Amino acid sequence: MTRTVHCRKYKEELPGLDRPPYPGPKGEDIYNNVSRQAWDEWQKHQTMLINERRLNMMNAEDRKFLQAEMEKFLSGEEYAQAEGYVQPKE
């Protein structure tokens, strides 16, 4: 049976992740409060931000920026977009 969580982003019960994506309390929080759908969408958005903004994951400031954007994205707040990106119409 699929594990469900009350997703922080979508405010509804959705299938959860199979395991925490990070070690420690942050990973446990995501595991318990973020759906697989929201996490998959974040990973795509994260890749777009890294590529479009040319973020260097060796740079502490770039990692801090990405961490803050992840919090915003997964909480349903307004978050940074890649410059010139237009969301596809559903």
From Swiss-Prot:
Superkingdom of origin: Bacteria
InterPro entries linked to this entry: Fe_traffick_prot_YggX, Fe_traffick_prot_YggX_sf
Cystine crosslinks: none
Membrane recorded as keyword: no
Keywords, in A-Z order: Iron
GO CC field: cytosol
Pfam families: Iron_traffic (PF04362)
MF annotations from Gene Ontology: iron ion binding
Any one Gene Ontology BP term: cellular response to oxidative stress
Record-linked NCBIfam families: PRK05408.1
HAMAP family: Fe_traffic_YggX
Family named by the database record: Belongs to the Fe(2+)-trafficking protein family.
Function per UniProt: Could be a mediator in iron transactions between iron acquisition and iron-requiring processes, such as synthesis and/or repair of Fe-S clusters in biosynthetic enzymes.
Name of this chain's protein: Probable Fe(2+)-trafficking protein
Organism classification: Bacteria, Pseudomonadati, Pseudomonadota, Gammaproteobacteria, Pseudomonadales
